[in-house]
């Protein structure tokens, strides 16, 4: 069973834009999303508890508060949410994880923005 546990109940979001930053090729999405979180000084909003995600906890810098490896951060002023993960989502966990994220987005009338990298395509004759 998948669940998203909201820890910042006082934040109000109206049809937010969700920036997805899962680790992928070149970590482009992860790095860009982490930059957005830092730039807007976003608040830790919620954590994911999904079957198949590694059972680990993480902490950031000097803050020793343990958090799940997949988290949502929010900026109420900009109606912005960032989906951040310190672990890749396995192929086995992907369907349930995707359903969990999709349900949350539908419930909050959110607009997703997906970030990912692409490998460099070699031109013919290029070494």
Give, region by region, the residue ranges found by the protein language model:
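Mid-sequence, gly/pro-rich, charge-dense loop/helix-turn segments that line enzyme active sites
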Residues: 61-62, 76, 117-127
């Amino acid at each position: 069973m998948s669940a998203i546990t909201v820890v910042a109940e006082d934040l109000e979001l109206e049809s937010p834009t969700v920036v997805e930053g899962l680790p992928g090729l070149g970590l482009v999405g992860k790095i860009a999303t982490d930059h957005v979180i830092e730039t807007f000084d976003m608040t830790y909003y919620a954590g994911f508890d999904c079957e198949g995600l590694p059972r680990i906890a993480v902490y950031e810098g000097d803050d020793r508060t343990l958090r799940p490896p997949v988290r949502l951060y929010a900026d109420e002023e900009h109606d912005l949410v960032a989906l951040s993960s310190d672990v890749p989502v396995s192929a086995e966990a992907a369907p349930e994880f995707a359903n969990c994220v999709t349900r949350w987005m539908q419930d909050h009338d959110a607009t997703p923005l997906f970030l990912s990298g692409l490998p460099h395509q070699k031109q013919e004759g290029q070494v």
